[in-house]
Amino acid sequence: MHPFNLGAYIIVYGVFLEKYMIIHTVKNGETVYSISNYYGVSSELTVINNGLSGLEEKLPEGLSIVILRPSKTYTVSQNDTTRAIAFKNGITLNTLYRNNLILNGNDLIFPGQTLVIEYDEAPIFDYAIGGYAYTNIAEAVLNETLPFMKLFMPFTYGFNENAEIIELNDDIILSRLFHYGAGEAFFHLSTLTENGSFSNTLSSYLLADESLWSILADNVIKIMEEKGYSGLDIDFEFLNSSDRYIYPIFISYMRERVNQTGRKLIVAVPPKTSSDQPGQLYEGIDYKLIGEAADYILVMSYECVIL
């Protein structure tokens, strides 16, 4: 799978069977050209689909390369557009983008250009890709990534002690998501403060006062409805151990409120190896109770970055 950097982090989950794909392990002396020639595919496709620009003749030994063979292609004619080509061939525009990474999610094509409509080898199971992105993400990175997205979380909305929402300037990146029609936007609600750290003082204050929960839910839902968010992603980190049992109750309340509007709720949790794992990141989290309270759980694995 071609790697992308959203300026934050990507979550990828799915099931692929290798027998439906060609995975080539580079041997000493092999190049992109020799490998592509062996399999009868375009070297340009091999480079683009594996992010190998600049490495064509100096591939590291042992590198695994995905070989994709087009089963149907299309040659661009004068006055063709990407949307017209997709419609003519019975695929979505995003499928055209995904099959042709060289487009970078853009519509710039030229007569004589060969585009891939279908590949021989494809995953037999569905997949989903979700990601968090800062609002200052480079437009080019956003455009080339969005056609692959099924979940998208602009990072991040906050709140204060009165349960008022700290706004996020997400209009531009949301407009790009809706332009591609590629996925669902989830409202990311966290306890991240202006100094870049998660505040367990703020989370404890909120969790201790249930009267604030309805205010927070009202404010969150109002913005979700105004901006077209499909769900809520709650991300309270470094919770105090004393909040371990009240947090799932709060999650259950928020889930009920957003479910009433036809939306889903995700909770992001740190990876734990045991229920009693010590550490500030883990002691306030109860997998079982949170799992029962939320629609979905996102188990994160980036604690090595924030510890």
Q: Which role does the model predict for each range below?
A:
Residues 1-20:
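N-terminal amphipathic/basic-hydrophobic helices that include classical n-h-c signal peptides
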Residues 17-39, 63-90, 113:
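Primarily a LysM-type cell-wall glycan-binding module
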Residues 56-57, 63-78, 83-84, 104, ...:
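Intrinsically disordered, low-complexity Ser/Thr-rich linker and spacer segments
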Residues 76, 80, 167-168, 207-215, ...:
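Soluble non-cytosolic domains of exported or imported proteins
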Residues 120-216:
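Glycan-recognition patch characteristic of GH18 chitinases/ENGases
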Residues 132, 153-155, 186-190, 233-237, ...:
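A cross-family glycoside hydrolase active-site/sugar-binding cleft signature
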Residues 161-168, 245-249, 253-307:
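Substrate-binding surface in catalytic domains of secreted glycosidases
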Residues 217-246, 296-307:
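Active-site groove signature of glycoside hydrolases
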